From Swiss-Prot:
Keywords: Protein biosynthesis, Transferase. Attaches a formyl group to the free amino group of methionyl-tRNA(fMet). The formyl group appears to play a dual role in the initiator identity of N-formylmethionyl-tRNA by promoting its recognition by IF2 and preventing the misappropriation of this tRNA by the elongation apparatus. NCBIfam families: fmt. GO terms for molecular function: methionyl-tRNA formyltransferase activity. The keyword Transferase applies. It catalyses: L-methionyl-tRNA(fMet) + (6R)-10-formyltetrahydrofolate = N-formyl-L-methionyl-tRNA(fMet) + (6S)-5,6,7,8-tetrahydrofolate + H(+). This is Methionyl-tRNA formyltransferase. Pfam families: Formyl_trans_C, Formyl_trans_N. It is an enzyme of class 2 (transferase). Its EC number is 2.1.2.9. PROSITE patterns: GART (PS00373). CDD domains: FMT_core_Met-tRNA-FMT_N (cd08646), Met_tRNA_FMT_C (cd08704). It comes from the Bacteria. It comes from Pseudoalteromonas atlantica (strain T6c / ATCC BAA-1087). The lineage of its organism: Bacteria, Pseudomonadati, Pseudomonadota, Gammaproteobacteria, Alteromonadales.
Length: 315
C-alpha cells in the first residue's frame, strides 16, 4: 500500500478539479498542478483561468501552464519536480513518451468510461447517445495512444432512463476521485490489464450540427440525443424561423397517427407536443425559445400555439 505519494496533477475543467480536490484532502502531497493556458471567455473575452488553476492557487500549489510538453524545457521542468506519479484528468495536452516515463510510477489517467469503450473526447455523452445501460470510470496506466493504456481499476455506474450528460457528469465526478484514491493506495501492487482493442469504440466530439434534430431518426434515438446533448450543444429544431431547443422529451409507446410524415406535429396540448419521427413519436415536454428560459410545453403553447399547430411539419 502506498501512502504519502508526491503527485503532479494535470487537468483543466471542473471534472478534473474534483479529482484534484480529493488529492489535496488525502494523505498524498500534490507538489504541482499542470493545466491549460488561460483562455479568453465570456462576452468581454477576458483571459479566464481553468478550474484546476483556480483550485491549485487557493491551496498554494505551484501551477505550470506550458503550451506544449514537447519542449526540452518543459520536460526538464517536470523531471526537476521528482514526482512519484503524475495524475492526468481531462488535461487536453498530448504527453510525449519522455513525460510518461518521468515519474517513478508513470502517469495515471482517469477516464469517464469503461475502457476500451468510448475512448476519446466525449465518453459521457456518447454512452447516453448510444443507449448504454452502464458506464463508469477507468483508471489506466497511460501510454502514447489515445486512452489505450493498461487498466488498473474501474468502477461501474448504471445509466438511468432520465440521466442527462449533466447528471451523469456529476455522478462520475464523484465516482472518479474514489477510484483514483483506491488505485493510488495499491499502486505498485496492481497488475495492469491490457485493453482488448477489438472492443474499442471512439467517443467523437459533439458538434452543434449534430444537435440539429433529424426527424427521420427513431423517437428512441432522438430522446437519447436530447439527454446526451444536455447541457451542450442542446438538441434543437427550427420553427417559424427560430431555433427551438428541446430540453426534455419522452418516447410515445403506442402509435398516435398512422400516416404522419417525419417532423409532423400530431399532438399539441398541455401534456406535450407530439412529433412523428422515422419510427415512433417524440413527446416534447420542455422547450426553450431563443434568449428565453426553458418552459413546459403548456406555457410555450399559451404564447406560441400558432407555431405548433397539429399538422405543421418542423424542419
Amino acid at each position: 500500500m502506498k501512502s504519502g505519494l508526491k503527485i503532479v496533477f494535470a487537468g483543466t475543467p471542473e471534472f478534473a478539479a474534483n479529482h484534484l480536490s480529493a488529492l489535496i484532502e488525502s494523505e498524498h502531497q500534490v507538489i504541482a498542478a499542470y493545466t491549460q493556458p488561460d483562455r479568453p471567455a465570456g462576452r468581454g473575452k477576458k483571459l479566464h483561468a481553468s478550474a484546476v488553476k483556480q483550485l491549485a492557487q487557493q491551496h498554494d500549489i505551484p501551477v505550470y501552464q506550458p503550451a506544449s510538453l514537447k519542449s526540452e524545457e518543459a520536460q526538464q521542468q517536470l523531471a526537476a519536480l521528482n514526482a512519484d506519479v503524475m495524475v492526468v484528468v481531462a488535461y487536453g495536452l498530448i504527453l510525449p513518451q519522455i513525460i510518461l516515463d518521468t515519474p517513478k510510477y508513470g502517469c495515471l489517467n482517469v477516464h469517464g468510461s469503461l475502457l476500451p469503450k468510448w475512448r476519446g473526447a466525449a465518453p459521457i455523452q456518447r454512452a447516453i447517445w448510444a443507449g448504454d445501460a452502464e458506464t463508469g470510470v477507468t483508471i489506466m496506466q497511460m501510454d502514447k495512444g489515445l486512452d489505450t493504456g493498461a487498466v488498473l481499476s474501474e468502477l461501474r455506474l448504471a445509466i438511468t432512463p432520465i440521466d442527462t450528460s449533466a447528471t451523469l457528469y456529476t455522478k462520475l465526478a464523484e465516482l472518479g476521485p474514489k477510484g483514483l484514491l483506491e488505485t493510488l493506495a495499491s499502486l505498485g501492487d496492481l497488475t495492469p490489464q491490457a485493453q482488448d482493442n477489438t472492443l474499442a469504440t471512439y467517443a467523437e466530439k459533439l458538434s452543434k450540427q449534430e444537435a440539429k434534430i433529424d426527424w427521420t431518426m427513431t423517437a428512441a434515438q432522438l430522446e437519447r440525443n436530447v439527454r446526451a446533448f444536455d447541457p451542450w450543444p442542446v438538441a434543437y429544431f427550427e420553427a417559424n424561423g427560430a431555433a427551438i431547443k428541446v430540453r426534455s422529451a419522452e418516447v410515445q409507446q403506442t402509435p398516435i397517427c398512422d400516416n404522419a410524415k417525419p417532423g409532423q406535429i400530431i399532438q399539441a396540448d398541455k401534456h406535450a407536443i407530439g412529433v412523428q419521427t422515422g419510427d415512433g413519436v417524440l413527446l416534447i415536454k420542455t422547450l426553450q425559445l431563443p434568449g428565453k428560459k426553458p418552459l413546459a410545453t403548456q406555457d410555450i403553447l399559451n404564447g406560441h400555439s400558432d407555431w405548433f399547430s397539429v399538422g405543421t411539419i418542423l424542419s
